[in-house]
Regions:
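Flexible inter-repeat linkers and adjacent short helices
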Residues: 1-102, 106
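A generic structural signal for well-ordered alpha-helical segments enriched in polar/charged residues
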Residues: 48, 128-131
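Hydrophobic transmembrane helix bundles of membrane-integrated enzymes that assemble
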Residues: 101-103, 123-128
Length: 136
C-alpha cells in the first residue's frame, strides 16, 4: 500500500464518538482550570476531528455547549451570545438528550442569563441544573 493510499484510508476512517467525547472532557477540564492555551490547543484538535467523527447529535450539542463556555473564558462575548442562541435552537430541535447534556445546558444557560444581567432567569436555570445534577 502506498503512502497516498494509507493517507486516503485514514481520512475515510470514521473516529468513534467516544474518542471525541474523551477529548471534549479533557477540554472542559482545561476550561474549568482557566488553562487558556491548553484549552485553545485541545479545541483546535477537536475541530480537526469532528468532520471525521461518527455522527452523534448529543456529542455535537455537548461540543457547542463547551464552545460557548470556552468563548466566555476567552472573553469572546459577542460570539458566545450568538452561539448560545444557536444552541437553544439546536436543543429545541432534538427529541431528547441525556441527563449530563441537560445539566450542562441548564448550567450554561444560567451563565448566559447572568452575563446578560438577567439574574432571576439565571437563578432559575441554576436551580434546574441543580435538579438535573441529582439524577446524574
Amino acid at each position: 500500500m502506498t503512502w497516498e493510499e494509507r493517507k486516503d484510508k485514514r481520512l475515510k476512517t470514521k473516529i468513534a464518538h467516544e474518542e471525541v467525547a474523551g477529548m471534549l472532557n479533557q477540554w472542559y477540564v482545561m476550561i474549568k482550570r482557566h488553562e487558556v492555551s491548553q484549552a485553545v490547543s485541545i479545541k483546535c484538535d477537536i475541530e480537526h476531528q469532528l468532520p471525521n467523527m461518527e455522527e452523534n447529535q448529543d456529542l455535537l450539542l455537548y461540543f457547542n455547549l463547551l464552545d460557548y463556555r470556552h468563548k466566555l473564558l476567552t472573553e469572546e462575548f459577542a460570539a458566545s451570545n450568538k452561539l448560545f442562541e444557536d444552541i437553544q435552537e439546536q436543543k429545541a430541535d432534538m427529541q431528547s438528550t441525556d441527563d449530563m447534556i441537560e445539566y450542562y445546558y441548564f448550567f450554561f444557560a444560567g451563565m448566559y442569563e447572568f452575563h446578560k444581567k438577567d439574574y432571576t432567569n439565571a437563578i432559575n436555570y441554576y436551580k434546574l441544573a441543580e435538579e438535573k445534577l441529582r439524577t446524574i
